[in-house]
């Protein structure tokens, strides 16, 4: 018989286990908050925003909802979705896999994916970035963040949890965004040390993009 954990999406298993520890470990990321400020400065009042891999809802969904925007947060982890709904009552949250979630073209003013693609393979990451680019209306924004390291299917521990990680180098990840039809308006690099005894410092890359207007 297949164990329950083996039938579930690996990312869901990892983040169910981490819960609020993940939020605490990354709460001090100034680069993440600066990225959110970049987006907030450009959104029209009451914008509809998709938050992919919403986690506990903080800081992304919370910052957007507090500013009066209509936020849909999605995550494969039921624990994270429950925490987010409790912590950010002004947003909507769904347990869903962004690879399969139906998305209408141009149905959002902006989309965010902060470090939520790393447990997908490269083809899946490219496909998801393409889906987000299409889901954002022409003239809308997309913010993508990753750990810009050229690795594929690397197994290791993340905050004590076993993970299998795939990522792109910085230039290659930017190329993914461009191939999806996004214009990269700005990119920011940062080094961040999560506040967790089993975490190690990691490079972060933030791409601030726009879907060109027709």
Where are these regions (language model features)?
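Core SAM-dependent methyltransferase catalytic element
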Residues: 193-214
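A short acidic, Gly/Pro-enriched loop at the edge of an enzyme's catalytic core
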Residues: 99-111
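Short alpha-helix
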Residues: 165-181
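Conserved beta-strand signature within the Rossmann-like core of class I S-adenosyl-L-methionine
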Residues: 139-146
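A short glycine-rich, Lys/Arg-flanked "PGG" loop and its adjoining helix->strand segment in the class I
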Residues: 126-138
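Conserved class I S-adenosyl-L-methionine
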Residues: 2-45, 150
């Amino acid at each position: 018989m297949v164990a329950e954990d083996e039938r579930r999406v690996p990312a869901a298993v990892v983040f169910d286990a981490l819960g609020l520890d993940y939020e605490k470990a990354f709460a001090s990321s100034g680069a993440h908050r600066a990225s959110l400020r970049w987006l907030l400065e450009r959104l029209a009042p009451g914008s509809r925003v998709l938050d992919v891999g919403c986690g506990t809802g903080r800081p992304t969904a919370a910052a957007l909802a507090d500013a009066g925007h209509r936020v849909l947060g999605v995550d494969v982890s039921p624990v994270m979705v429950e925490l987010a709904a409790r912590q950010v009552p002004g947003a909507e949250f769904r347990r869903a896999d962004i690879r399969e979630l139906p998305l209408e073209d141009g149905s959002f003013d902006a989309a965010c994916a902060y470090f939520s693609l790393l447990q997908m393979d490269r083809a899946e990451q490219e496909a998801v970035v393409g889906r987000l680019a299409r889901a954002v209306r022409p003239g809308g924004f997309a913010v993508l963040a990753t750990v810009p390291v050229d690795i594929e299917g690397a197994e290791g521990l993340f905050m004590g949890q076993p993970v299998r990680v795939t990522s792109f180098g910085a230039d290659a990840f930017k190329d993914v965004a461009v191939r999806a039809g996004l214009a990269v308006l700005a990119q920011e690099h940062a080094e961040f040390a999560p506040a967790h005894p089993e975490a190690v410092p990691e490079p972060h890359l933030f791409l601030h993009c726009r879907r060109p207007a027709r």
